[in-house]
Amino acid sequence: LGFNLVLSWCLILYTLMLERTRSTSPPSDFKGKGKSETLGSALIGWSTGLIILSFAMTALIFITFPRFGLGFISLNTSYSPIAGFSDTVTLGDVGKIKQNPAVVMRVEYTQGGEIYKPDSQIIWRGVVLDHYNGRTWTSTLATEFETRNRPGTGLNLFRVSNPREVVQQNIFMESFNAPYLFTHGVPLFMDGNFIHVQMDKNFVFKTSDPRSGPRKYTLISDISDHDVSYSLDMPQNEPLLFPSRFLQLPDISSKTHDLADRLTQNARTDENRAQKILNHFADFKYTLEMENDPGKTALEHFLFQRKEGHCEYFASAMVVLLRSAGVPARLVNGFVGVEWNEWGNYLIIRQQHAHSWVEAYIPGKGWTVYDPTPPDPSLVTPNT
């Protein structure tokens, strides 16, 4: 505000001085007419009004910019890739991007037409990875479902037998080289400024449309935690039709297999096994500074020596232990949303919020989320 005041007055004085030098009327013409006081009052009033108006407009633009600017203005046109997000995950890569505060998405939540503020920790699902070669995770599932979206009409996706927490999410995504359409919860409906929509058997959504600027799309999702009845032509128990895909392991050490056996030896169900493996990481610590023993794989060094790492190590280790114990599991890469903007009432997701977690298939419950990573101090973000 102070800057606006000084700048405005400087511009006004400069204009007056400029007009004075341009004037051809002699100064005597203005003497004795009693206008100076009136002119000064009017000038002060008009300039003050303009300053107040400019400040109000600035505040309005600041608050509403995420709602309009990201959807329709070409931002970040260099299409730089998100360093912490790709369709593969290699141990150690996340450490380089967690300090990057660049904004990836802004998300507005509404429920029944009213502003909805979700819980502080929100996971935005991006890509699911099922194959591990000892260092890198990749996806081997082909596209299962492909259709054309008519912007303004949208697509009905899943249906939920007993919806309990249905919200609308308006997503404004920056330009970057990633075709994925991130989702939070079970997506029931999707619409956006894209035509082609694809989904694989891991329920990962993406578009093959060429990028022409920031992406804007709307989701209606059920963000409660319950079983899902699929509206797509896929049986409910399909994950069990190809369990080997989610039990695949590279050649890992007998020490790792022994750890999985020891942790789950008294567990009677897959849910118990998953919980016992999750509990094993309770005393591990979070760090971005990774060290590797040249004589061991990065994962073994993490499990048996260092016991410190970032989310990719925790998620990778849990999936490997689950699969060794016979529990189908997969690694998920996306973002965790923790930063809420109180001025504009929207969620901010930054590159430093990139995250990896685990989905394990539990009979009777389906794919269940487990996050073995301890809290990251950099993600404890106050409301802004």
What do these predicted regions represent?
Residues 1-384:
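Helix-boundary/low-complexity linker signature
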